From Swiss-Prot:
Encapsidates the negative strand viral RNA, protecting it from nucleases. The encapsidated genomic RNA is termed the ribonucleoprotein (RNP) and serves as template for transcription and replication. The RNP needs to be localized in the host nucleus to start an infectious cycle, but is too large to diffuse through the nuclear pore complex. NP comprises at least 2 nuclear localization signals that are responsible for the active RNP import into the nucleus through cellular importin alpha/beta pathway. Homomultimerizes to form the nucleocapsid. May bind host exportin-1/XPO1. Binds to viral genomic RNA. Protein-RNA contacts are mediated by a combination of electrostatic interactions between positively charged residues and the phosphate backbone and planar interactions between aromatic side chains and bases. This is Nucleoprotein. Belongs to the influenza viruses nucleoprotein family. The gene is NP.
Amino acid sequence: MSDRRQNRKTPDEQRKANALIINENIEAYIAICKEVGLNGDEMLILENGIAIEKAIRICCDGKYQEKREKKAREAQRADSNFNADSIGIRLVKRAGSGTNITYHAVVELTSRSRIVQILKSHWGNELNRAKIAGKRLGFSALFASNLEAIIYQRGRNAARRNGSAELFTLTQGAGIETRYKWIMEKHIGIGVLIADAKGLINGKREGKRGVDANVKLRAGTTGSPLERAMQGIEKKAFPGPLRALARRVVKANYNDAREALNVIAEASLLLKPQITNKMTMPWCMWLAARLTLKDEFTNFCAYAGRRAFEVFNIAMEKIGICSFQGTIMNDDEIESIEDKAQVLMMACFGLAYEDFSLVSAMVSHPLKLRNRMKIGNFRVGEKVSTVLSPLLRFTRWAAFAQRFALQANTSREGTQISNSAVFAVERKITTDVQRVEELLNKVQAHEDEPLQTLYKKVREQISIIGRNKSEIKEFLGSSMYDLNDQEKQNPINFRSGAHPFFFEFDPDYNPIRVKRPKKPIAKRNSNISRLEEEGMDENSEIGQAKKMKPLDQLASTSSNIPGEN
């Protein structure tokens, strides 16, 4: 038995280790909330939690701060009052009591140095170490990336620039900040690594600096950034000719390298790559769960398995979600809290590219396709309509997919033609095999016989699966279960429904797009960073809020938050 297997923690040991980190994150979150004047229920508002975590990630980003300080030195020559250390965070605050509760948007000022000081007091002084802040903030960045994937299909533009737009289902983690990308590599889709590799190949051709730098590789060696990217691609790629192609890229010429990467990406739509899936919740949700579970909290500190679904449900009972005026499609439309709850659920579990009919079979309420949703960007808007606790819950659970969906032997540009599984549940293949074959047939002929041989073998794998698509199943033998079926006694068979693709175009629904002209940009307040300044207007109606329904579920939590006066 390998040392790695011998040292593997038991589930109880793993939950205790998780709880240690999660509790430290919660305490740091509470302290920063208090620093910017948030108390009680306000700490449990989702949009506040997202804003605070974004501020933390930016304050811990050394390169961002270096650029900002450079701009500050230039700005100070023109404005002696400029403060490079000051940042503004846009938040939702509560006013009134009983049935006369209102919520309004404000911008609270604090400083980077103060946030860093708070983090050091809870996490230790070495914030630059991956084990101290890297993993914590990496998971925070992963949630933010999942959110953007659902709202904007963030990976589609990158996929279109670097190949075919259909490849966006391979771009999990496309929005993760560069600093955390390699820390979170095993949670990132192969399409993101392929896009990075193409960028490095282009940079080498154009003579850009940094493409030949020495970086750490696996097994303690060093090499170029391209070698590091190709190691990650080789590890994720489906076993067989795709991995052999990945090993050829570093030494191949420009055209061959790009073509090999295209083949790996396009074939990966069907020959599914490996990716590690975990549940990741914002810290405000972990705080909400801790307030409910109290002494039992440690037993629910899980990122996978049945308890991950349970702790998500528990957190959803206490958090508040804001409804603002203005959606992605219509500036005058009011956001739907039910739709935002669905987006939150899908972001926490990374479900943007999972079989949508499977996700729908696991939750308590009907779900919507993306183009039917009334949502904004999850930032704090100017006009708060309501703040409510969502009703959406999981009723079933399944193991997370940590293995290859298939074993090794086995013009619709921009539309979704494939799924990327999150849950290990037996299902038929949903990929449009014909479209994958069309993409692969674009590969040009080469005199390089070994590459041609590998391309031929990839096509053969695709053809075999295409001919036997109706008989082949992914995750053979795996099932989902009722949430109370802890021992997996009654497996539930799944049959894919009519809508396997979340981003499927719905011809029966054609929303009217209404976007108001942008207001003139007001003179920038030099004491507020760009972090939360987007959309802020000095003459706006910030603070002019409508009456809200009180959060009955949250009303009794204030006195339970540590350090609350």
